[in-house]
């Protein structure tokens, strides 16, 4: 649920989740960066065993992982996602979801995401910054029988409406970009990573 920016309320909600609600894992969104209102970091640093990361990816640089021990002595995994909606989505799909699928023993099932090679149908110019960039895209079968990806219009990390149109994340390696027609790595976001079968 939603918790206000209040440390007492947040601590109570987290402890209730691990003690009364019987959760197997906690996923938080927001408050894990360096700002004045990033109280999730403040509270979890005090009550949990956490590690805080600045991951070399864009979007979704801030990320946290650790455990919060419940009253029965069980260490419950905690995934701390960034608060920006697109950053939160990307970090969940690429980091938290795979870990949760391993916990559920479903990593190789039909519900998992697939990472495949595809052809990018547009050029991306970028500058080296030490990060892997992830474009939100629409993947479909091309006439050549391969997966092709087209970019959704808006790529800014606050553009949730445009991101909702995407069914794939495309990896743009660190460097000077990729050209139209290049082969890229694609994470398919649909259940089981499936696309419509028609070309």
Regions found by a protein language model. Name each.
Residues 43-199:
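Flexible glycine/proline-rich
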Residues 1-47:
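N-terminal small/polar loop signature for handling phosphorylated ligands or for N-terminal nucleophile
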């Amino acid at each position: 649920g939603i918790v206000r920016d209040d440390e007492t309320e947040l601590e109570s909600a987290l402890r209730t989740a691990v003690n009364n609600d019987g959760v197997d894992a906690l996923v938080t969104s927001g408050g894990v960066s360096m700002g004045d209102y990033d109280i999730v970091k403040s509270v979890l640093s005090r009550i949990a065993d956490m590690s805080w990361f600045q991951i070399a990816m864009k979007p979704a640089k801030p990320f946290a992982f650790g455990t919060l021990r419940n009253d029965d002595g069980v260490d419950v995994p905690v995934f701390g996602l960034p608060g920006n909606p697109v950053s939160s989505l990307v970090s969940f799909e690429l980091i938290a979801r795979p870990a949760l699928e391993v916990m559920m023993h479903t990593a190789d099932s039909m519900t998992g995401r697939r990472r495949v090679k595809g052809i990018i149908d547009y050029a991306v110019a970028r500058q080296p910054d030490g990060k892997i960039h992830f474009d939100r895209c629409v993947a479909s079968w091309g006439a050549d029988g391969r997966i092709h990806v087209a970019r959704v219009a808006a790529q800014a990390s606050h553009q949730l409406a445009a991101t909702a149109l995407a069914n794939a994340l495309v990896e743009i390696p660190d460097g000077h970009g990729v050209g139209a027609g290049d082969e890229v790595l694609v994470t398919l976001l649909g259940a089981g990573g499936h696309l419509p079968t028609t070309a």
